[in-house]
Amino acid sequence: MRRLLALVLSLAGLVFTANGYRPVSKQGYLAGYAFGSGVFASELPTQAIVTQLAALAVVSPRLSARVRAITWLVSVLSWLGLLGLRRTGRAADQPLTAALDAGLGPDRRAESGDLWKRPAPGGATAKKPGAARMLRIYRDYAHDADISYGECGSRNHLDIWRRPDLDRGGRAPVLLQIPGGAWMTGNKRGQAHPLMSHLAELGWVCVAINYRLSPRSTWPDQIVDVKRAIAWTKEHIAEYGGDPDWIAITGGSAGGHLSALAALTPNDPRFQPGFADADTRVQAAIPFYGVYDFTRSDSSMHPMMVPMLQKHVFKVKRREHPDEFRVASPITHVRQDAPPFFVLHGTNDSLIPVEQARSFVARLRETSDQPVVYAELPCAQHAFDIFGSARAAHAAVAVEQFLAEVYASRPASTSVGLTKLAPS
């Protein structure tokens, strides 16, 4: 029994690693395993090696020489695979750079130092990227927390991320972060920390929001709250050192969907009940691994997605109310005057197939007059940016470079003073 258990554990480790290269399934409940194990294998491969090694060290002394040799051989194959995933993650700057060059041109800006980066001597709080950093990063930057932007209690709260030495009288560019969670879970804390901490350290003001969730709330409550948060930010962010005239929006998964939809429906009264006159325009959008078309039934839509949406989010059948799903799809609202977009998606996404991003980007490029950048990241799973992995750090730098190019191209009327950081 002990021998069998050891062999099963070593083979399970090999399957875990292989799933990081090619998900075992993108349909049904197995997709959940493919996502859960895949994101750990691809984003935390070193930790996975240590875990597998520790487990093998515990059981190995009790095995016969033959079984021990087999389990070690299988485990070594798994570790070599994990080292390959580590190498792919650390090289994620290559597809990101290629995407930026293709979308913005090879003469694009490579950094943003002369635009808004004004670090005061000794005032920086940035630390080296890493998973451990993410455990403490919130307290370094989220100095204004649980601010109300609406009337729905904690679901209408937001946090403001900034450097503690940021001049509140300045006009820092602003990033609005929309959390994901299948429109039913998710919180302003715990997502996009690598990106927000990177930009906050450079002198940005970042706003992370909560919004109403299903099944307690029903679509379009989620996008209404996002729009209300944009309106609040435009009205109040100057009090915290932000520029109300320059706001970019981002989010992952459901947040990717909501950020894209918000960017493509500025001032749309259907999504602004009671505040139709509020300005909800944004200057750029950076959706991560989002859903962009709810009307499809092919391989671009996870087979469990539509039943979940019908039962818990929209609470109507798609075949009976197709317009509700069509209007909720960002691809429906692609327009010539869309803001610049930077779309990021992993090739191995088991929850939202990469085909969603491909078709959305194709429509944007056909229609929009503004730059459209698309980065497809090899071996990246859903939620690849949650941990402080090398891939997440590269993605944060790429987003900075994209925003630097867009910010530098802003109309002269909006360039009212560059961000300055106060002396520490």
PLM feature segments, named:
Residues M1-S424:
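Alpha/beta-hydrolase superfamily serine-hydrolase fold, recognizing
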